[in-house]
Amino acid sequence: MDTPTLEKIVVAALEDIKARDIEVIDTSKNTPLFDRIVIASAESGRQTRALAQNVHDKVKEAGGEIIGTEGQDTGEWVLVDLGSIVVHVMQPAVRAHYKLEELWNTPLASRRAATR
């Protein structure tokens, strides 16, 4: 599945369960490992796990491949590896602490809010 199609599926799956502050970062020029990072916030461990599960389910339904999922035990930060896209679903305090957007050192102009 191509990256733009996969991105749309991921964003729609996150929006379905009311993820907040969904952000897509193009990492294709920063690393050969994946093309995009999608970061979203959830209000609770239960919502974090539900969002990650919905991404997993929707990608699988569309014929996509799930490489792996990490962090579902605590639900503070759940990562879903889809190969060309890595999805991070985080509770707000964890997101503020790790600042992945800054870690990838992308200026605000090259980041964009996710759209379906």
Please provide the spans of the model-predicted regions:
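Long, contiguous binding/interaction regions
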Residues: 1-29, 43-53, 57-62, 69-72, ...
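Active-site beta-strand termini and strand-to-loop segments that position acidic
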Residues: 80-82
